[in-house]
Structure formats: structure tokens, C-alpha cells
A protein has these predicted regions:
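Gly/Ala-rich beta-loop-alpha elbow adjacent to hydrolase catalytic centers
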Residues: 2, 6
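Conserved alpha/beta-hydrolase catalytic His-Asp/Glu region
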Residues: 32, 47-101
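Catalytic active-site module of serine/aspartate enzymes centered on a nucleophile-bearing elbow/loop
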Residues: 140-171
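Cofactor-binding loop segments of dinucleotide-utilizing enzymes, especially the Rossmann-like FAD-
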Residues: 25, 119, 147
Length: 171
């Protein structure tokens, strides 16, 4: 969602952004495939848990990757009564998953340098949309991250930082 929002902002307000980093997404409409993650989180009765560790154990029944569970649990908060809650509005995200998956048609070409960083194992297929990306973002570069899926920054944080830092520091 962040990558799509950044691309829309860049296209609507040319010159506002000096460099653009887009992570594992293209300016196209995708089939909504994250709804199951959200439904799983939404189905948990958080009142049954006393610790984050207990919630992580429960989530491990659905999500094998520790790094992915840690990423999801960044949205898990505790209120003053020591009750857990999700920081994001899961119901709204589920209800609007189709709209979130769409990419609006915005005419014009970006003059912003853009880095499209993607996981080689990702189902989002950034390179399948290279021509579409180049049409809208002709100053784009592409950076694959080996052995990473869609959650590149979670799965390979050091490589992610290395690539992004190099791009942002370049002239």
C-alpha cells in the first residue's frame, strides 16, 4: 500500500519528491491476496492472551516465518488495561481489500528517479510489469533481492538497507 501511495503522490505532485523507493509492487492492479492474512489476525480473540509470546505461538499455527510474524505483530498494541488490540483497522482493510489492490489511472510521466526494489521470490512479479513501470517512471532502476519474497524489508533487512542507502546517496 505504501508503494502505491508513494507512486500516486509522485504522479500527482511532480517535483515534490526527489527520489522514490518502491518496494515489491508495480503501478498496476493486483488481485487482492492479503485478505487471508487480515482475516486470520481478525479472527484471533486477543482477550484470551496474556503475553505477546502467546499470540506469536498462536500465529505460528498460520504463519511459519518468524520474521513475517514479527512484522505482523508490529501492529499489536497493549492498552492501559493491559489488553491487546490491533493498531490497524482490520475490518476496514478487509472490506476495502479490492480497492486497496487497484492502482488508479493517472496520466503523465514521472520525472523522479525511482528504485523498484523487489524480492526474487515474490508473487508480485515486478519485472513482469517492467514495461508498464518504464512508461510511467522512465528514470527507474530495478534491484532484485535474492531469496526474498514480498516482505523484502522483513526477510532481508540488511540487504534492503544497503540497496536503499546506496540509491538515496547516489547523484
Amino acid at each position: 500500500m505504501g508503494g502505491k501511495a508513494a507512486m500516486v503522490l509522485d504522479k500527482l505532485y511532480q517535483g515534490f519528491i526527489s527520489k522514490l523507493v518502491i518496494v515489491d509492487i508495480a503501478p498496476v492492479t493486483y488481485a487482492p491476496n492479503f485478505e487471508n492474512y487480515l482475516k486470520t489476525l481478525s479472527s484471533l480473540d486477543l482477550g484470551r492472551f496474556n503475553t505477546r509470546s502467546e499470540i506469536d505461538t498462536k500465529l505460528s499455527e498460520y504463519f511459519e516465518e518468524v520474521s513475517f510474524r514479527s512484522f505482523l505483530m508490529q501492529n499489536l498494541k497493549m492498552d492501559e488495561k493491559k489488553s491487546f488490540y490491533w493498531r490497524v483497522n482490520l475490518t476496514s482493510l478487509i472490506r476495502n481489500s479490492v480497492a486497496i489492490s487497484e492502482f488508479p489511472v493517472i496520466n503523465g510521466v514521472s520525472n523522479t528517479e525511482a528504485l523498484f526494489l523487489y524480492g526474487e521470490l515474490s508473487e508480485y512479479g515486478v519485472m513482469d510489469h517492467k514495461d508498464t513501470i518504464k512508461e510511467s517512471f522512465p528514470l527507474s532502476e530495478f534491484a532484485p533481492v535474492a531469496k526474498a519474497g514480498h516482505w523484502v524489508h522483513v526477510e532481508k533487512p540488511q540487504k534492503f538497507l544497503e540497496i536503499v542507502s546506496k540509491f538515496l546517496k547516489s547523484d
